[in-house]
Amino acid sequence: MKISYKNLWKLLIYKKMNKATLRRFTSISAATMAKLGKGENVNTDVLIRICEALKCKLSDIMELE
């Protein structure tokens, strides 16, 4: 199974937020953002920070394919 973050990108569009703004709000590194873009594993702490910034649940930003 592979992790997909396509729901994260849809949510960013819905909230009219770009990746740079998300990085600023969550202190995510460029390397971690690249991992998200490639659908690679990232630290759970990063996912929690994203959810806190976007006021959503983990299931709102990721899924297993």
Where do the PLM segments sit?
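Short C-terminal boundary/hinge segments that cap the last helix of small helical domains
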Residues: 55-65
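A short, Lys/Arg-rich alpha-helix, primarily the initiator
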Residues: 1-20
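Short alpha-helical DNA-recognition segment
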Residues: 16-34
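Short, basic-rich loop-to-helix N-cap that marks the start of a DNA-contacting helix
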Residues: 39-52
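The alpha-helix within a helix-turn-helix
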Residues: 12, 23, 51
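Residues within the helices of the helix-turn-helix
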Residues: 9, 20, 34, 48, ...
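DNA major-groove recognition helix of helix-turn-helix
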Residues: 26, 37, 65
